[in-house]
Swiss-Prot record:
This is Cytochrome c oxidase subunit 1-alpha. It comes from the Bacteria. Fe(II)-heme a binds at residues 91, 408. Keywords: Cell inner membrane, Cell membrane, Copper, Disulfide bond, Electron transport, Heme, Hydrogen ion transport, Ion transport, Iron, Membrane, Metal-binding, Respiratory chain, Translocase, Transmembrane, Transmembrane helix, Transport. Heme a3 binds at residue 406. Cu cation binds at residues 273, 277, 322-323. It catalyses: 4 Fe(II)-[cytochrome c] + O2 + 8 H(+)(in) = 4 Fe(III)-[cytochrome c] + 2 H2O + 4 H(+)(out). It is found in: Cell inner membrane. One of its GO terms (molecular function) is heme binding. Its cofactor is Cu(2+); heme. Subunit I and II form the functional core of the enzyme complex. Electrons originating in cytochrome c are transferred via heme a and Cu(A) to the binuclear center formed by heme a3 and Cu(B). This cytochrome c oxidase shows proton pump activity across the membrane in addition to the electron transfer.
Length: 554
């Protein structure tokens, strides 16, 4: 992205110095976004290959005789189950650890959280630089793992992204070990980033900006940072035990030596359930700002919105075993986790109805960011979440495509749509150039139709009893699988179109000549700065009237 030249120091920064050695929070945020986009492209390519295989019954593409991109009915094809497992595993690992959190927390969080609170930079700029390059190392390790020797004398670890033992402890080759190291490094970069965010938020707010005057996106990133800080060390301990079981003869998860594989499930999901809220909370913050801007109204219920995010974060830590209803828990335990899980619907409902109340009576402008916010179908995932929170119903739905549909409505039509909303909302601010509105709207409709075509039919497949993570299925399931795969092709085409939109915008987009190119309801501090912001922002700290409407109108 082109930088605005504001002084002679900036003119001396070459390309290498700026992008490889930068400690500037804005540049590091952009780096996070681009790297997450690259990891996302790899991950969705794996997704499309999965959906190609599942479009029709029988195995057509993933053959032991060799991978194919074109089905050949005349040629023999022995199913390559390891390749299938590898594709499933790395799609999950990349998306969960290297795409959504780095984009929302590392990208938008790094770039805009300091701007929202009027801070000149992050509290620890060099730590910020270290966090990013550790993230690059993590992505590199994950891709190296995909290409390294694994089980069945083939590349990659085919154990699922959750790395459950005994599959993960018995998988041959060192691809599994590299995957564990990739997750470790991902955890380290997130923990360092979280420490930085928390310190910045607590110590570097503009004069007069008390806690409950901080914009909702900054609050969302701050709460997410606490969740990362409290949950990722637990995951680190669990996968270290896994590494020890694989290489040093310990038996933490081996019943033959007194271990217990269910212990690993508890450790993993104590991290894994807060993880889904870490992925979605920054998205909640973005959606709040977008809806407020394009409904031309202040956000409804600011304080309940903050408290709802804090409640979601707290409750997220005490519901982990709802992933484990079928793992032999007592009825008493299941009853507790069932009730606690349904309780999360209350603060989530507060947020959803506050967004609706913000739009109610507003003068709504259907620009591209607002379309993404309106299509933020996290709510559909939330409704199916209440269904599978019931232990009795989960007996039926566990490990079926109903779970896949539930999870992807939360992640794909939730977190991913929030990333797109944030990109279109802020790309003019970050680059100084605006996207073509028609292209943004076309991308939205392609992705919206494609995503719903993929995941909505999967509810039906789950209801019919189709288990997830299988390379083949009976012909009875073929109708909805075919529709789901068509949706995947439409979504993939829309993602490639989005990449084109981003590069067109950066190099040929219409220049933005004003700080605030939306309207007066885009009222956080970044809209007082030039587009793009200069390298050094808020060297003179902002005054209350710059960000507080009550002060400005006195």
């Amino acid at each position: 992205m082109s930088a605005q030249i504001s002084d002679s120091i900036e003119e001396k920064r070459g390309f290498f110095t700026r992008w490889f050695m930068s400690t500037n929070h804005k540049d590091i945020g952009v780096l996070y976004l681009f790297t997450a986009g690259l990891a996302g492209l790899i991950s969705v390519t794996l997704t499309v290959y999965m959906r190609m295989e599942l479009q029709h019954p029988g195995v057509q593409y993933m053959c032991l005789e060799g991978m194919r991109l074109v089905a050949d009915a005349a040629a023999e094809c022995t199913p390559n189950a390891h390749l299938w497992n590898v594709v499933v595993t790395y799609h999950g690992i990349l998306m969960m650890f290297f795409v959504v959190i780095p984009a929302l927390f590392g990208g938008f969080g790094n770039y805009f959280m300091p701007l929202h609170i009027g801070a000149p930079d992050m509290a620890f700029p060099r730590l910020n630089n270290l966090s990013y390059w550790l993230y690059v190392c993590g992505v590199s390790l994950a891709i190296a793992s995909l290409l390294s020797p694994g089980g069945s004398d083939q590349p990659g670890a085919g154990v699922g992204w959750v790395l459950y033992p005994p599959l993960s402890t018995t998988e041959a080759g060192y691809a599994m070990d590299l995957a564990i190291f990739a997750v470790h490094v991902s955890g380290a970069t997130s923990i360092l980033g979280a420490i930085n965010i928390i310190t910045t938020f607590l110590n570097m707010r503009a004069p007069g900006m008390t806690l409950f005057k901080v914009p909702l996106f900054a609050w969302a990133v701050f709460i997410t940072a606490w969740m990362i800080l409290l949950s990722l060390p637990v995951l680190a301990g669990g996968i270290t035990m896994l590494l020890m079981d694989r290489n040093f003869g310990t038996q933490f998860f081996d019943p033959a030596g007194g271990g217990d594989p269910v212990l690993y499930q508890h450790i993993l999901w104590f991290f894994g359930h807060p993880e889904v809220y870490m992925l979605i909370l920054p998205g909640f913050g973005i959606i709040s700002h977008v809806i407020s801007t394009f409904a031309r109204k202040p956000i409804f219920g600011y304080l309940p919105m903050v408290l709802a995010m804090a409640a979601i974060a707290f409750l997220g830590f005490i519901v982990w075993a709802h992933h484990m209803y079928t793992a032999g828990m007592s009825l008493t335990q299941q009853t507790y986790f069932q009730m606690a899980t349904m309780t999360i619907a209350v603060p989530t409902g507060i947020k959803v109805f506050s967004w609706i109340a913000t739009m109610w009576g507003g003068s709504i402008e259907f620009k591209t960011p607002m379309l993404w916010a309106l299509a933020f179908l996290f709510t559909v995932g939330g409704v199916t979440g209440v269904v599978i929170a019931q232990g009795s119903l989960d007996r039926v739905y566990h490990d079926t495509y109903y779970i896949v549909a539930h999870f992807h409505y939360v992640m794909s039509l939730g977190a991913l749509f929030a990333i797109f909303a944030g990109t279109y909302y802020w790309i003019g601010k970050m680059s100084g150039r605006q996207y073509p509105e028609w292209a943004g709207q076309l991308h939205f409709w392609m992705m919206f139709i494609g995503s719903n075509l993929i995941f909505f039919p999967q509810h039906f497949l789950g209801r019919q009893g189709m288990p997830r993570r299988y390379i083949d299925y009976p012909v009875e399931f073929s109708y909805w699988n075919n529709i789901s795969s068509i949706g995947a092709y439409i979504s993939f085409a829309s993602f490639l179109f989005f990449i084109g939109i981003v590069f067109y915008t950066l190099f040929a987009g219409k220049p933005v000549n004003v700080p605030n190119y939306w309207n007066e309801h885009a009222d956080t501090l970044e809209w007082t700065l030039p587009s793009p912001p200069p390298e050094h922002t808020f060297e003179t700290l902002p005054k209350p009237e710059d960000w507080d409407r009550a002060q400005a109108h006195r």
